[in-house]
Design a protein with these regions (language model features):
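Charged alpha-helical initiation segments
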Residues: 1-36, 40, 148-169
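A broadly used, surface-exposed interaction patch
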Residues: 5-8, 15, 53-108
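Short, charged/polar micro-motifs that form catalytic or ligand-binding hotspots
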Residues: 11, 15, 27-39, 43, ...
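Generic structural signal for well-ordered, non-membrane alpha-helices
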Residues: 23, 47, 108-112
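Hydrophobic alpha-helical packing segments in soluble, helical-rich domains
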Residues: 38-55
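Amphipathic alpha-helical scaffolding segments
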Residues: 42-47, 61-64, 127-134
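Charge-enriched, short contiguous segments at helix-coil
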Residues: 92-148
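Polyanionic, low-complexity intrinsically disordered segments
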Residues: 135-216
Length: 216
């Protein structure tokens, strides 16, 4: 057991809301309640991914909205959504294929550990899921992949009604997008912005052209 280690993991958490449940996991860890800690860690993993899907949907992302509607419908029907949330997170590129495989492995262990007479939960089991929980989602803010950046701009161009009319609202709209784009993806962003600006000028589409200039 390494108390300092779990505290270091906590320092990597991006969202303060996640820290609340993480503190309960730490309490389980300190008190050697490894089974309870494991199950709480699984819950936090799923809830963190779910929040990112909702966040993506709130930004009018088509895949985010589709996946969230599916999850929401399952919740309304009182169905288990853990596996669907994981799959939806992969579909929205919130997690990679490798991370999806890791989460499936954690899910299988969670199902075993949920039955107290089947297998003892060791400190190493709890440490493992905590490390993956932090690596896969808690330490990562929601961000857009290259493909998602291209899709977002394509959606804006083909559905210009989503562009706010007020210039200040346009600025806020753009800031919401930029927060989700990593610096390493800026070249992809600007390449697409200049491409759509050129096309808008050729088509005399002043609305799109003005928006692209503001974005740039």
């Amino acid at each position: 057991m390494d108390i300092n280690w779990v505290e270091i993991q906590k320092s990597q958490i991006c969202n303060n809301d996640d820290a609340i449940l993480y503190n309960e996991i730490v309490a389980c860890y300190k008190n050697k309640l490894y089974r309870s800690g494991y199950l709480l860690a699984w819950i936090l993993l799923i809830e963190s991914l779910k929040r990112k899907i909702i966040e993506l949907a709130s930004l009018d992302d088509s895949r985010g909205k589709t996946e969230w509607q599916l999850i929401e419908q399952m919740e309304q029907n009182h169905q288990s959504t853990d596996c669907q949330i994981t799959l939806s997170a992969k579909e929205c590129e919130i997690i990679s294929d490798t991370e999806f495989t890791t989460i499936n492995s954690l899910w299988q262990q969670r199902c075993i550990f949920a039955h107290p007479y089947m297998q003892e939960v060791k400190v190493s089991d709890l440490e493992y899921i905590i490390s993956k929980l932090v690596d896969i989602t808690l330490s990562k803010p929601l961000s857009l992949s290259k493909k998602m950046i291209e899709e977002r701009l394509d959606e804006i161009v083909n559905s210009p009604h989503v562009i706010p009319v007020n210039p200040d609202e346009q600025n806020n709209f753009i800031k919401q997008q930029l927060v989700l784009i990593k610096e390493k993806h800026y070249p992809v962003l600007y390449k697409n912005l200049f491409f759509y600006l050129s096309k808008a000028r050729e088509a005399n589409n002043n609305t799109i052209a003005a928006f692209m200039r503001r974005y740039i």
